[in-house]
Amino acid sequence: MQKYIVEARSLLALAIPVVIAQLSQTAMGVVDTIMAGSVSATDMAAVAVGTSIWLPAILFGHGLLLALTPTVAQLNGSGRRSQIAHQVRQGFWLALCVSVLIMLVLYNSDHVIKQMDNIDPVLAQKAVGFLHAIMWGVPGYLFFQVLRNQCEGLSKTKPGMVIGFVGLLVNIPINYIFIYGKFGAPALGGVGCGVATASVYWVMFLMMRWYVTRARSQQDIKLEKGFAAPDWQVMKRLSGLGLPVALALFFEVTLFAVVALLVSPLGIVAVAGHQIALNFSSLMFMLPMSLSVAATIRVGFRLGQGAVEQAQVAAYTSMAVGLLLASVTAVFTIVFREHIALLYNKTPEVVTMASHLMLLAALYQLSDAVQVIGSGVLRGYKDTRSIFFITFTAYWLLGLPSGYLLGLTDYILPAMGPAGFWIGFIIGLTAAAILMVLRIRWLQKQPTAFILQRAAH
């Protein structure tokens, strides 16, 4: 029992800074929305529309680079720290390549926005302007993620927390300057949020670069040692590890976007109630998501040491801690669901709808915790292809169709509206959780040599 308690402490020590970093990132989006909304409803809507395109695009790049965390963790655990710098340099090349692709997508976003039904021309123009501004921050964000993944692979999660919080503080005055046109800058409204966010990402990258070159714990990792040409073999291997994770993230984000579109014809009350339940669940999701990062680090480090049994301890401890935390947040959601809904909106019908959906959201949190931490464990084992197949099957072949049938048709039960889609979420996430656990158990039953060879690849 003692080994599980010790492991739980190590996991929480890694996870807590990740939670704070994620809260800072989320708060940046909230600040953008509030400050753009103070100019006009059109500017606020433009930021929302722009973000709906920006988020899947940047999360694809983010997911691709997550391959670095288990790679660095295993090199660190096996005492091969001298090889880390080369992997990270290739991570920068990979980030540069995917930055170009994402920037091209964002630059041509006007074609997507103009296809939206009945969109106001002024809103469309502002949304495109927001995307054309924020796209210049793509390399800065992805370069920052490369160095953050290096630090997290070395079990250093606090730098990401501190720099993320500083980024939030820097974002507010830069927003103020470019949204309202202060100190000689043009008043750009919602477009100014894009300028500010792009600037902040470059500031965060430069701060992280400064940290890794001066941190005593990383003095042996010489990133700046001469020019490093692309190593296509390493980049191919990192892409092979990261692409399934990137696609899984992309499918998850687009699933929620599709459900939002399917709910929208059901009326303002249904949309508002669904959005409140989803927004609050997203906040609660940060806890298991941070444990997922910690699980990747701990499992990867233990496999690097050749300690297969300790990797199992890390895997099961992370899921047990995640389930415990999810149980607490689920009870909190059930008990305070009406109070939570009132924080978002005071309309009685909306509060009633949101409160009803939050009962389902409480169940959703349990399955969500297991599947996201299971995903982190599998990343630690470098078994990322299974993550893609599991999430695609669970979300798009089980969750969405069942949600559609329950929410909008009478084939099984009378149409349930948004509640039907939430039951679909629960079905999909529960399936993902079960499949993740089964895959982890299958992996752990393999011969030690097979597990270590796979992890060392």
Curated annotation (Swiss-Prot):
GO CC annotation: membrane; plasma membrane
GO biological process, one term: response to antibiotic
Membrane-protein topology: Multi-pass membrane protein
Signal peptide limits: none
GO terms for MF: antiporter activity; xenobiotic transmembrane transporter activity
Transmembrane regions listed in the UniProt entry: 11-31, 46-66, 93-113, 127-147, 160-180, 188-208, 243-263, 283-301, 316-336, 357-377, 387-407, 418-438
Keywords from the UniProt entry: Antiport, Cell inner membrane, Cell membrane, Ion transport, Membrane, Sodium, Sodium transport, Transmembrane, Transmembrane helix, Transport
One Pfam assignment: MatE
Localization (cell): Cell inner membrane
Annotated InterPro entries: MATE_fam, MATE_MdtK, MdtK-like, Multidrug-R_MdtK
Family: Belongs to the multi antimicrobial extrusion (MATE) (TC 2.A.66.1) family. MdtK subfamily.
Role noted for this protein: Multidrug efflux pump that functions probably as a Na(+)/drug antiporter.
Name the record gives this protein: Multidrug resistance protein MdtK
